[in-house]
Curated annotation (Swiss-Prot):
InterPro entries: Ade_phspho_trans, PRibTrfase_dom, PRTase-like, UPRTase/APRTase. Catalyzes a salvage reaction resulting in the formation of AMP, that is energically less costly than de novo synthesis. Keywords: Cytoplasm, Glycosyltransferase, Purine salvage, Transferase. The gene is apt2. Its main location: cytoplasm. It is an enzyme of class 2 (transferase). One of its GO terms (molecular function) is AMP binding. GO terms for cellular component: cytoplasm. Homodimer. Its EC number is 2.4.2.7. It comes from Methanococcus vannielii (strain ATCC 35089 / DSM 1224 / JCM 13029 / OCM 148 / SB). This is Adenine phosphoribosyltransferase. Belongs to the purine/pyrimidine phosphoribosyltransferase family. It holds the Pfam family Pribosyltran. The keyword Glycosyltransferase applies.
Length: 173
């Protein structure tokens, strides 16, 4: 299945010059959603994963599907102030400044193997923040999987030493 045909391109969103890659048509179509889940699952099957982590918000959508398929738990990583229990946090670099991510303090046990699932790898800032957060609380990041990768933004370069999968690659913004 060619997932590229299911990704909607929206020019000049969220700002002029950006060509937004919208994954919601994949989620709307059961066959595309199932195919995406299966492709990520196949990649992760031999990596001895204990838990799936997904960053807010679209990482939740794909991460939950993959976790369910692999019969694993799912852990959300959120922006500050969104999780009700004790959290660990990490600051991470954005193109212009810093942001923060949080995870529940009891969500990953020391030594657990973690796969991070998200919709998009762009500059790598968010996923690098997620990996630091997982490692900070004792997890091992065994794999990273993305539906889309924007190769011209070189996010993969920040992820050396990690197993990285992307299903669809674009070389434009």
């Amino acid at each position: 299945m060619d997932l590229r045909k299911k990704i909607r391109i929206i020019d000049d969103f969220p700002k002029k010059g950006i060509s937004f890659k919208d994954v919601t048509p994949i989620l709307k179509d059961p066959k595309s959603m199932k195919h995406t889940t299966k492709e990520i699952t196949k990649y992760l099957e031999d990596k001895n994963i204990d838990v799936i982590v997904g960053p807010e918000a679209r990482g939740f959508l794909f991460g939950i599907l993959v976790a369910q398929e692999l019969d694993l738990g799912f852990v959300p990583v959120r922006k500050p102030g969104k999780l009700p229990f004790k959290t660990f946090s990490v600051d991470y670099a954005l193109e212009y400044g810093l942001d923060r991510l949080e995870i529940h303090s009891d969500s990953i046990e020391k030594g657990q193997n973690v796969a991070v699932v998200d919709d998009l790898l762009a500059t790598g800032g968010t996923v690098l923040g997620v990996t630091k957060l997982v490692e900070k609380i004792g997890g091992n990041v065994s794999a990273l999987s993305f539906v889309i990768e924007l190769t011209n933004l070189n996010g993969r370069d920040k992820l050396k030493g990690y197993n990285v999968q992307s299903l669809v690659k674009y070389d434009d913004l």
